A protein has these predicted regions:
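Conserved acetyl-CoA-binding loop-helix of GNAT-fold acetyltransferases
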Residues: 58-75, 93-97
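Short hydrophobic/aromatic beta-strand element in the GNAT-like acyltransferase core
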Residues: 12-15, 25, 55, 114-116
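Conserved beta-strand in the GNAT
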Residues: 15, 21-32
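Conserved acyl-donor/pantetheine-binding loop and adjacent beta-alpha core of acyl/acetyltransferases
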Residues: 27-61
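Active-site rim helix/loop that mediates acceptor-substrate recognition in acyltransferases
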Residues: 1-13
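Conserved GNAT acetyl-CoA-binding A-motif
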Residues: 52, 75-87
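Conserved catalytic-core motifs of GNAT/GCN5-like acyltransferases
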Residues: 83, 101-115
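Active-site beta-strand termini and strand-to-loop segments that position acidic
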Residues: 17-19, 118-122
């Protein structure tokens, strides 16, 4: 997959391990994300610099992956943005539990709609 290879070559792809086994993966990228330039039915919490989390995937063997990924991101960046499908209720609830705020709707490069969230370290 070209997208995955690009993430790896840009050093944006990370894994979560447990006892030496990979249990999850995610992308963490600093800087402006083109798909986040326009947001509908809401606004971002601020216009400052941010990092974006993309493509969190877990093997399901452990709960709390969103928490681990968020803590890793917040150790490096003060503002984190993330998006998810409207139907992904599990992810939406996990984001709210972690303190992310719903900000509005964005559209991906392929035109698909996503719900956008932001978390600012306090």
């Amino acid at each position: 997959n070209e997208l995955l290879l690009n993430d790896i070559s840009n050093s944006d792809s990370f894994v979560v391990t447990d006892s030496g086994s990979i249990i999850a993966t995610f992308v963490l990228r600093a800087g402006e994300d083109p798909t986040y330039k326009e947001i509908r039915e809401g606004d971002w919490l601020d216009d400052g610099p941010y990092a974006t989390i993309h493509r969190i995937a877990s093997d399901g063997s452990r709960k709390g992956i969103v928490h681990l990924v968020t803590q890793y991101a917040l150790a490096q960046y003060d503002s984190i943005r993330i998006d998810t499908h409207r139907d992904n209720v599990v992810m939406r609830n996990a984001l709210l539990r972690e303190g992310y705020r719903y900000c509005g709707i964005i559209h991906c490069w392929n035109g698909s709609e996503r719900l956008a969230y932001q978390l600012i370290a306090r």
